[in-house]
Amino acid sequence: MERFVVTAPPARNRSKTALYVTPLDRVTEFGGELHEDGGKLFCTSCNVVLNHVRKSAISDHLKSKTHTKRKAEFEEQNVRKKQRPLTASLQCNSTAQTEKVSVIQDFVKMCLEANIPLEKADHPAVRAFLSRHVKNGGSIPKSDQLRRAYLPDGYENENQLLNSQDC
């Protein structure tokens, strides 16, 4: 009798999971949103472990409100942390440097024309006045550096000016 009993065919136990998908496959599929570390799939902006087997779990996470909020915060932090290019930094410094040099050269020229010894620039009252009332006045060096570095430039400039006036 057992031979004639009809049994139902075994139910197919097919779930909707991809059995041979690795976290790296999902990273290449979803681009910069995800990264793989130690065989686990992470959301880059949320820093949450995701199930790499179910694609729907990943897409649901990427559409969620918490992910979009954290992604906006993550991008804002990256913008703030982003380094300035070297050329932009050097341009800022070069502008400030040229302004500093022009202030120092004007100060040396003023001292020479008014017959003020450069040693007077070392006096505390002169230093206080320059730093308080002159833009970049605190950047004027001591008298020995003024004499060594900036006096020859002023001398050459004045000689060229006198030579051009004589002709």
From Swiss-Prot:
<dbReference type="GO" id="GO:0010468">
    <property type="term" value="P:regulation of gene expression"/>
</dbReference>
<dbReference type="GO" id="GO:0042802">
    <property type="term" value="F:identical protein binding"/>
</dbReference>
<dbReference type="GO" id="GO:0005654">
    <property type="term" value="C:nucleoplasm"/>
</dbReference>
<feature type="modified residue" description="Phosphoserine">
    <location>
        <position position="56"/>
    </location>
</feature>
<protein>
    <recommendedName>
        <fullName>CGG triplet repeat-binding protein 1</fullName>
    </recommendedName>
</protein>
<keyword id="KW-0805">Transcription regulation</keyword>
<keyword id="KW-0238">DNA-binding</keyword>
<dbReference type="InterPro" id="IPR033375">
    <property type="entry name" value="Cggbp1"/>
</dbReference>
<dbReference type="GO" id="GO:0005829">
    <property type="term" value="C:cytosol"/>
</dbReference>
<keyword id="KW-0804">Transcription</keyword>
<dbReference type="GO" id="GO:0000122">
    <property type="term" value="P:negative regulation of transcription by RNA polymerase II"/>
</dbReference>
<dbReference type="GO" id="GO:0040029">
    <property type="term" value="P:epigenetic regulation of gene expression"/>
</dbReference>
<keyword id="KW-0539">Nucleus</keyword>
<dbReference type="GO" id="GO:0005634">
    <property type="term" value="C:nucleus"/>
</dbReference>
<dbReference type="GO" id="GO:0003690">
    <property type="term" value="F:double-stranded DNA binding"/>
</dbReference>
<feature type="short sequence motif" description="Nuclear localization signal">
    <location>
        <begin position="80"/>
        <end position="84"/>
    </location>
</feature>
<dbReference type="GO" id="GO:0140297">
    <property type="term" value="F:DNA-binding transcription factor binding"/>
</dbReference>
<comment type="function">
    <text>Binds to nonmethylated 5'-d(CGG)(n)-3' trinucleotide repeats in the FMR1 promoter. May play a role in regulating FMR1 promoter.</text>
</comment>
<feature type="modified residue" description="Phosphoserine">
    <location>
        <position position="164"/>
    </location>
</feature>
<keyword id="KW-0597">Phosphoprotein</keyword>
